[in-house]
Amino acid sequence: YMGSGTSLVEASIKGINAIGTDLNPLARLMSHVKTTHYDLSCIRDTFSMMQALFFEYSEDKVKNKNFDNISNYTYWYSRDSLLRLSYIYQVINECVALDFADFFKVPLSETVREVSFTRNGEFKRFRMKEEKIKDFKPDVFRLFEEKVIRNINGLEEFNSIKYPCNIGIYDFNSTIEIPSDIIQPNSVDMVVTSPPYGDSRTTVAYGQFSRWANEWFNFENAKTLDNLLMGGRVQKEELFETKSI
């Protein structure tokens, strides 16, 4: 469970070979972007082009107005936010070079949650009270742009520290099997994992927190992710034997 890939970034800036795995496609996207040395000049030029297109926005320029892939979208979003989010995604898909698209999907993944009617500071989905919703009018483009600028600053710092190393990002379930073709036995010097916490489905709601972006990007298992993560399903028999420390 590599989460947002912070451990992989730290390994990268120290020149340490590292492998991360996560069943959550959003976690893999974020980890990939955070450990990639993008061309800073190209990213900045692309962002300037996107900002110009945002300035030209109008509702009739939004091509995809079908939001059926988003659970209860009228409950969680205003129509204006839905259209502007769709326009940003459209610009990324149609106008951004494929090599740089993921870089801009990461700030969009944050924006889709922040402009929704979900309460701030919650991992689980809890809707704002009606009186707050009436006054909630997020500036979708500005929020997205602020996150892009923050990430560009982070990229500039990351690019200033380059050491030769290999970073691998995978989706295998380490509680079931660690593929020997990816990680050979006795080849790992250190394992970094999260501290113990409750199961994902009822306690941490890791999948619920990620579901906003996973649905927007049409990632596989977006609606059932918590069932696939730790504690999502009860196992009636041991999957493998472990040795005591």
Where are these regions (language model features)?
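Short, Φ-rich (hydrophobic/aromatic) sequence segments
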Residues: 47-50, 148, 210-216
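Short C-terminal domain-edge/linker segments immediately following a structured domain
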Residues: 31, 50-53, 135-136, 220-227
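SAM-dependent methyltransferase catalytic-core segment centered on the flexible catalytic loop
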Residues: 197-245
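Non-catalytic nucleic-acid substrate-recognition regions in nucleic-acid-modifying enzymes
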Residues: 13-14, 19-21, 25-98, 102-110
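Conserved proline-anchored active-site loop of SAM-dependent methyltransferases
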Residues: 1-14, 18-25, 31, 104, ...
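SAM-dependent nucleic-acid methyltransferase catalytic core
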Residues: 82-193, 198-205
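Noncatalytic linker/hinge segments flanking ATPase motor cores
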Residues: 42, 58-68, 132-133, 230-240
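Glycine-rich, phosphate-binding/catalytic loops in enzymes
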Residues: 36-37, 186, 207-212
